[in-house]
């Protein structure tokens, strides 16, 4: 019996003890548990990845909707600004035309007043000159009759 034999016997005993203690089953159970844990972690990672993809898709959709809404708001604001500008332009043009018409009316009234004033003064001067001429050349009775007739004529023409 040499040392190799005893080494073989010790090995067989050791393997027997391992089998008796169910070490291969524990190793298999430990490996199975580890494999199950890895499988669960992979499943969890897959689930988290799908959830992240769904969230990403949802956020991208919301971003597109927000961009579209912002674009619509900008377009609406531009249309509103154009309407306000055109409305202000129309109102300004109307205001200017009203002010121009009012100024033209005032000018026309001033012209009429000036013409009437000139006519009135011309009539007054003509009447005074005619009265003076008549007073110098005509006697009192004829002058008085002529003066009355002239005054009557002027009154009818002015009215």
Curated annotation (Swiss-Prot):
The chain crosses the membrane at residues 1-21. It is a single-pass membrane protein. InterPro entries: ATP_synth_b/b'su_bac/chlpt, ATP_synthase_B_chain. Its main location: membrane. Keywords: ATP synthesis, Cell inner membrane, Cell membrane, CF(0), Hydrogen ion transport, Ion transport, Membrane, Transmembrane, Transmembrane helix, Transport. One of its GO terms (cellular component) is proton-transporting ATP synthase complex. GO terms for molecular function: proton-transporting ATP synthase activity, rotational mechanism; proton-transporting ATPase activity, rotational mechanism. It is found in: Cell inner membrane. Pfam families: ATP-synt_B. HAMAP family: ATP_synth_b_bprime (MF_01398). Belongs to the ATPase B chain family. F-type ATPases have 2 components, F(1) - the catalytic core - and F(0) - the membrane proton channel. F(1) has five subunits: alpha(3), beta(3), gamma(1), delta(1), epsilon(1). F(0) has three main subunits: a(1), b(2) and c(10-14). The alpha and beta chains form an alternating ring which encloses part of the gamma chain. F(1) is attached to F(0) by a central stalk formed by the gamma and epsilon chains, while a peripheral stalk is formed by the delta and b chains. F(1)F(0) ATP synthase produces ATP from ADP in the presence of a proton or sodium gradient. F-type ATPases consist of two structural domains, F(1) containing the extramembraneous catalytic core and F(0) containing the membrane proton channel, linked together by a central stalk and a peripheral stalk. During catalysis, ATP synthesis in the catalytic domain of F(1) is coupled via a rotary mechanism of the central stalk subunits to proton translocation. Component of the F(0) channel, it forms part of the peripheral stalk, linking F(1) to F(0). This is ATP synthase subunit b 2. It comes from Chelativorans sp. (strain BNC1).
């Amino acid at each position: 019996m040499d040392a190799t034999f005893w080494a073989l016997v010790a090995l067989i005993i050791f393997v027997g003890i391992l089998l008796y203690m169910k070490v291969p089953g524990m190793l298999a159970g430990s490996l199975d548990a580890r494999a199950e844990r890895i499988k669960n972690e992979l499943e969890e990672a897959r689930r988290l990845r799908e959830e992240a993809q769904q969230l990403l898709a949802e956020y991208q959709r919301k971003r597109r909707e927000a961009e579209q809404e912002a674009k619509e708001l900008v377009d609406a604001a531009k249309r509103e600004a154009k309407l306000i500008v055109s409305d202000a332009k129309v109102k300004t043009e109307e205001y200017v035309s009203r002010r121009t018409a009012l100024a033209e009316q005032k000018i026309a009234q001033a012209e009429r007043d000036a013409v009437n004033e000139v006519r009135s003064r011309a009539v007054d001067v003509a009447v005074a000159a005619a009265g003076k001429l008549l007073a110098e050349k005509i006697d009192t009775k004829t002058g008085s009759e002529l003066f009355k007739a002239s005054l009557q004529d002027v009154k009818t023409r002015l009215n």
